[in-house]
């Protein structure tokens, strides 16, 4: 990754306030990218599409999905807790990709 190839690129970073989000934002910005840092939970099925629409042109999508480290022992994780983890860390991924791909395909870039 060089500053030259990131200069002016619009980078959408999800969960920008969690896990690797702050560092990702800083590194992309240091290399000249325009960082669109989002910290919304993206739990609602329509949230990823709304985020991409509000971001406008997205050259690079960084799907940083995070949640606090679990404290429940693995043998005691309930179905509800597992569903919440899955909804936070997995469900947004295909929704984000589906939302951003059409514009990238149209531009033949991204």
Give residue ranges: language-model regions.
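Canonical Rossmann dinucleotide-binding motif of NAD(H)/NADP(H)-dependent dehydrogenases/reductases
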Residues: 3-36
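Active-site loop of short-chain dehydrogenase/reductase
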Residues: 9, 57-58, 105-110
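Rossmann-fold cofactor-recognition segment
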Residues: 36-46
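Conserved NAD(P)H cofactor-binding loop of Rossmann-fold oxidoreductase domains
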Residues: 64-71
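Substrate-binding pocket helix/loop in short-chain dehydrogenase/reductase
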Residues: 72-74, 78-86
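A short, exposed helix-loop element centered on a Lys and neighboring polar residues
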Residues: 97-98
């Amino acid at each position: 990754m060089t500053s030259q190839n990131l200069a002016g690129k619009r980078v959408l970073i999800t969960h920008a306030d969690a896990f690797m989000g702050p560092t990702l934002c800083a590194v992309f910005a240091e290399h000249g990218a325009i960082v669109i840092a989002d910290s919304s939970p993206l739990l609602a099925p329509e949230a990823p599409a709304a985020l991409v629409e509000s971001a406008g042109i997205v050259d690079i999508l960084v799907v940083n999905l995070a949640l606090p480290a679990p404290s429940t022992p693995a043998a005691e994780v309930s179905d509800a807790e597992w569903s919440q983890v899955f909804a936070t860390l997995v469900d947004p991924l295909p929704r984000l990709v589906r939302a951003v791909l059409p514009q990238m395909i149209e531009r033949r870039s991204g």
